[in-house]
Amino acid sequence: MKYTSYILAFQLCIVLGSLGCYCQDPYVKEAENLKKYFNAVDPDVADNGTLFLDILRNWKEESDRKIMQSQIVSFYFKLFKNFKDDQRIQKSVETIKEDINVKFFNSNKKKWDDFEKLTNYSVTDLNVQRKAVHELIQVMAELSPAAKIGKRKRSQMFRGRRASQ
């Protein structure tokens, strides 16, 4: 009886392992379709190195990688936007965008919408330029980790004083 359960477990592992080879993420097939469309399978594509992969390899910390990934995702969204009306790759683009939504935005629609909103701002629009410059000081303050830590320490210090009084 004991050997039978081992054999069944072994067979299950073999079946699941073989299924894993055939159950690729949907984006893989669609990315291959885009490679054919853009003629990105030719060896000359690799000339002069990679666009993104070397940059991603340079950064090991999660927060640093997220910054780089956000710029890369932004690039792909702009690329896809340029080809949104091409019916030959419409399905591939939509599938990949959905997969990015799951992997990068954790299926959070609000994050995705805000990200797209940011990537759609035109830097040549005078009104956008004026608003961006108007908000620059506040944005810079948000970027500074020292300011956030200082605020947190002060608020903890005041909370401690109130509790002891």
UniProtKB/Swiss-Prot annotation:
Type II interferon produced by immune cells such as T-cells and NK cells that plays crucial roles in antimicrobial, antiviral, and antitumor responses by activating effector immune cells and enhancing antigen presentation. Primarily signals through the JAK-STAT pathway after interaction with its receptor IFNGR1 to affect gene regulation. Upon IFNG binding, IFNGR1 intracellular domain opens out to allow association of downstream signaling components JAK2, JAK1 and STAT1, leading to STAT1 activation, nuclear translocation and transcription of IFNG-regulated genes. It comes from the Eukaryota. Keywords: Antiviral defense, Cytokine, Glycoprotein, Growth regulation, Pyrrolidone carboxylic acid, Secreted, Signal. GO terms for molecular function: cytokine activity; type II interferon receptor binding. Glycans are attached at N48, N120. Residues 1-23 form the signal peptide. One of its GO terms (cellular component) is extracellular space. It is found in: Secreted. Homodimer. Interacts with IFNGR1 (via extracellular domain); this interaction promotes IFNGR1 dimerization. The keyword Glycoprotein applies. It comes from Papio anubis. Gene3D superfamilies: 1.20.1250.10. One of its GO terms (biological process) is positive regulation of nitric oxide biosynthetic process. InterPro entries: 4_helix_cytokine-like_core, Interferon_gamma. The modification Pyrrolidone carboxylic acid is found at Q24. The gene is IFNG. Belongs to the type II (or gamma) interferon family. This is Interferon gamma.
